[in-house]
Amino acid sequence: MKKLYIRTFGCQMNEYDSDKMADVLGASEELVKTDNPEEADVILFNTCSVREKAQERVFHDLGRVKHLKQSNPNLIIGVGGCVASQEGDAIVARAPYVDVVFGPQTLHRLPQLIAERRHSGRSQVDISFPEIEKFDNMPPARVEGASAFVSIMEGCSKYCTFCVVPYTRGEEVSRPLDDVLAEVAGLAGQGVREVTLLGQNVNAWRGEITRDGGEQGDFAFLLECVAEIPGIERLRFTTSHPREMTQRVFDAYAKIPKLVSHLHLPVQSGSDRILAAMKRGYSVLEFKSVVRKLRAARPDLSLSSDFIVGFPGETEEDFEKTMKLIDEVGFDASFSFVYSPRPGTPASDLADPVPQETKLRWLARLQKRIDQQAQAISQAMVGRVERALVEGLSRKDATELAARTGNNRVVNFVGNPRLIGQFVDLTITAALPHSLRGEIVTTET
């Protein structure tokens, strides 16, 4: 039996795409996944170019599998994702042992690219943007577990000055409603009970309701439709953009109980001057207005965010405004990074860089503050009963189970493994730095 090894870098969109690569090659090549690259017949790296370190790590990992190609000339090594889109032929020039290079929109062509590589003996590169063609060429999803991702749109048309996504994934393209609903229904039929809708700007979905054109639906309508699918008990989405938060989305939080009380809403900075330089399209006041409306609809809403510190020209005053916003909003988790210029983006040409030591100092302060807020929120949950989906065995102790609450907290507890994939009610007994402890109250069958 031939085997496939996939190494995934970056965001949840990449995790979803990696699953699709496995589906495509499983259907066409009868490949089964392995966690050991040493025994693989095909090795794929699904890459991320959002951060500089992630990009360099790809080439480091490619170097680590080079010897496998030398011992097994039939081994196929491929590079996909955003680094592939950005670098293209340059990947083969830097690592000639790479057989195929493909972008996020051409992963469905993997079988053809591999076949052509074997036939011609030449490395194959396809980093075009054929919009949603890839979704028309996917076999039915194969899943394990009670949670799954579903991509509802691809690309980004916001062109923030620091970001490479529009250049590596293309502009925004929404999937038709019937396609999305068919995929979710298929997952529900396999036992999935929680679905996360994915997109670079997921709430910008404005796709056609049907393939014959005409009527358009907005993101709130899509949420309503997905929530009605039998078997789906919990609904998440990521990543959202503050500019796309409409009153209808606020209303969805008030009237769709299946929509979880957690939202990832990237703000990037608390300074209007820096937000304008980033071309984010909103002010701090407008962002706080979005938060107020969300919490008016769902008072217990938990918010996580993205922050970039050390953007060109950022001052101590700008950074303190970010810290003030963190205190005012009460974020309880974040993906925060020091700014690193990405080739080809407008921000990479900006002068007045912030010293690295200043960036690191700011980052440490920001992360510490959010960790403190997260711990306070977790501590307030102690004694409460939380409904949680049991995801699997605990990473900390394989004799225990791990479940996830609606506000995205992991709870470790003692329970029967047969509960995996079910919802349980848990009394929260302790708040640890990165997880909760709980005791089971009731179970669902």
From Swiss-Prot:
Belongs to the methylthiotransferase family. MiaB subfamily. It catalyses: N(6)-dimethylallyladenosine(37) in tRNA + (sulfur carrier)-SH + AH2 + 2 S-adenosyl-L-methionine = 2-methylsulfanyl-N(6)-dimethylallyladenosine(37) in tRNA + (sulfur carrier)-H + 5'-deoxyadenosine + L-methionine + A + S-adenosyl-L-homocysteine + 2 H(+). Its cofactor is [4Fe-4S] cluster. Residues 142-378 form the Radical SAM core domain. GO terms for molecular function: 4 iron, 4 sulfur cluster binding; metal ion binding; N6-isopentenyladenosine methylthiotransferase activity. Binds 2 [4Fe-4S] clusters. One cluster is coordinated with 3 cysteines and an exchangeable S-adenosyl-L-methionine. Pfam families: Radical_SAM, TRAM, UPF0004. Keywords: 4Fe-4S, Cytoplasm, Iron, Iron-sulfur, Metal-binding, S-adenosyl-L-methionine, Transferase, tRNA processing. Residues 379-442 form the TRAM domain. Residues 2-119 form the MTTase N-terminal domain. It is an enzyme of class 2 (transferase). PROSITE patterns: MTTASE_N, MTTASE_RADICAL, RADICAL_SAM, TRAM. Gene3D superfamilies: Methylthiotransferase, N-terminal domain, tm_1862 like domain. Catalyzes the methylthiolation of N6-(dimethylallyl)adenosine (i(6)A), leading to the formation of 2-methylthio-N6-(dimethylallyl)adenosine (ms(2)i(6)A) at position 37 in tRNAs that read codons beginning with uridine. Its EC number is 2.8.4.3. It comes from Aromatoleum aromaticum (strain DSM 19018 / LMG 30748 / EbN1) (Azoarcus sp. (strain EbN1)). GO terms for cellular component: cytosol. This is tRNA-2-methylthio-N(6)-dimethylallyladenosine synthase.
